[in-house]
């Protein structure tokens, strides 16, 4: 058996601590980087983190965003108790294109753009083919200062595309997402309906 003297033991403990701190820092840095790529509302210090995985062409997701999100914002986000994190989980090409537009646009308008995409979902998602749907989407975001040229550039932005697709793959592996919207509160998938009553009950247990 190899016996360690006191100095060796101290050195080993210090080395382990340094490695642990380095790994923790890398994990923290990755978390910050990932959040920069997401659309986030609310304080980073909030006790409750609510992840919303959704597809921009999903009617249930639109209903959740229009009817439930404002209630969560008013009761928990504005008070600093909760943070909302919107994560794209596109289920079709039209949703993927809308996600690309969302994430390659200026951070300052992303929330407004997300609201508009959901509010006008019934208008822009109807079309004979993807080109018509893209043109519909261009029309409904025009008054937010988004040009046709900017839209076209977003569609061919491989960096943005890869981030969205990799995020979708990672989310599916981590949370086994089978439908949208899927709500994850403090890293636990919400069971049951994604309605305000159910979410409120979960939040109240955590604050």
Language-model features: where?
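Cysteine-centric redox/oxidoreductase cores and disulfide-bonded domains
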Residues: 90-179, 184-197, 201-207
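Extracytoplasmic thiol/disulfide redox context detector
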Residues: 2-92, 96, 138, 142, ...
